[in-house]
Amino acid sequence: LLVTSDLQRARQTAAPLAALWTRTPTLAPGFREQGFGLLEGLDVPTIQARHPELWRQWLTHHADFALPGGESLRQFHTRVMDAVVELVAAHAGRRVVVVTHGGVLDMLWRSVRGLSLDGLRECDIPNTGVNRLRWAHGRLHITSWADASHLADLPAQPPTNIARA
């Protein structure tokens, strides 16, 4: 089973795998990136120029802070974990590939590790990295994380300008 966030960038990332497997991905809005509300789609320099106070507040990484029209980390975490539980219930015992976003992966990492939702990200999340998790005894377990070995033969990519870790 191939599941992807319904956002365009995740669908595009899933497309080669879907073609290889000759499967149509199941779209799952629960695996969308965090909702950034008013700041959705804006780049960092634009946010800093137009909304400096919101930018400052967002960088505090408080679990209950939500941008206007967006989700707090706590709301986001709840949505992601609800999506995981729903997926497990619907496909128990099956191997499922989920194409999703860095923020979603951060929520999974924090949940498995028992980490606070406050504070900076504490795990590597390379673009198109492979993370293997399994559901056992009523919870998620990480079996491998941030595997990018499938990218080893590609040319180095320039770093991205992402202000939030």
Model-predicted regions and their roles:
Residues T4-S5, T78, V99-T100:
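Short beta-strand scaffold positions
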